[in-house]
Regions:
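N-terminal Rossmann-like or analogous alpha/beta NTP/dinucleotide-binding catalytic cores
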Residues: 2-135
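Active-site cores that bind ATP or allylic diphosphates and position pyrophosphate for catalysis
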Residues: 112-247
Length: 247
């Protein structure tokens, strides 16, 4: 019997999960757990590139793991863990950093974007973020890494680092491939349906841990349009189309 391919995905403990995260990603992850050998890591070390309150970060990390299980990720079928609990992530990151070129990191578009948004907090940790990500992936000999378009460049860098290391020490690391799973529904804001549902806009965002009465209130206030017709038309009727997608 052919061995299952291994999937690694790291998720930052950024807070409560939303309806968008569930329909856009988590439902698909649940469907992958029978076909692949899946590792899901709460990457709390990545999260500290932005200032954190340690107690809050620990609480969110544990709470997020619990929510994944509640959404259907079976701990008997998946390995789920917190990044900082495995010191080999940081250890391997240092080793891989010695095989990573400064110019490669300088070209990372996500670093450039985040540096613009957080100009007062451009740290070495933010700059070397992709090296720690490579360590996360390579440590477990991962075959596939589920990514969005904004992370593809990081997987390519990971492959380059692994290839360079393997040239010195043959067959050490498996070369991972970017994996684009079946796309989930793209859920938009209830208040601004032209924008993706985001935690930064609480009134337009449904959190999985919201009380039933709060969920009802948010949907009752959801933006629609002045027409009487109910039909799916993302361009001309984004509000109605978003509600139909959720339904």
């Amino acid at each position: 019997m052919e061995a299952k391919k291994r999937i690694f995905s790291g998720i930052q403990p950024s807070g409560e999960l939303t309806l968008g995260s569930y329909m856009g990603a988590l439902k698909n992850w649940v469907s992958l757990q029978d076909e692949y050998d899946c590792l899901y890591c709460i990457v709390d070390m990545h999260a500290i590139t932005v200032r954190q309150v340690p107690a809050d970060l620990r609480r969110r990390s544990v709470a997020q793991l619990a929510q994944y299980i509640a959404c259907g990720l079976d701990p008997e079928k998946n390995i789920m863990f917190i990044q900082s609990h495995v010191p080999q992530h940081a250890e391997l990151s240092w080793v891989l950093g010695c095989y990573t070129q400064f110019g490669e990191l300088s070209r990372m578009t996500q670093f450039k974007d985040k540096a613009k948004k957080h100009a007062d907090n451009i740290t070495a940790g933010l700059f070397t973020y992709p090296v720690l990500m490579a360590a996360d992936i390579l440590l477990y000999q991962s075959d596939l890494v589920p990514v969005g378009d904004d992370q593809r460049q990081h997987v390519e860098l990971c492959r380059n680092i692994a290839t360079r290391f393997n040239n010195w020490f043959p067959d050490t690391f498996t070369l991972p491939e970017a994996f684009v799973p079946k796309m989930g529904a793209r859920i938009m804001s209830l208040g601004q349906p032209e924008n993706k549902m985001s935690k930064s806009e609480p009134d337009g965002c449904v959190f999985l841990m919201d009380k039933p009465e709060d969920i009802m209130r948010k949907f009752k206030r959801a933006v629609t349009d002045c027409e009487t017709a109910v039909r799916y038309d993302q361009q001309n009727k984004p509000g109605i189309s978003n509600l139909l997608t959720i339904y």
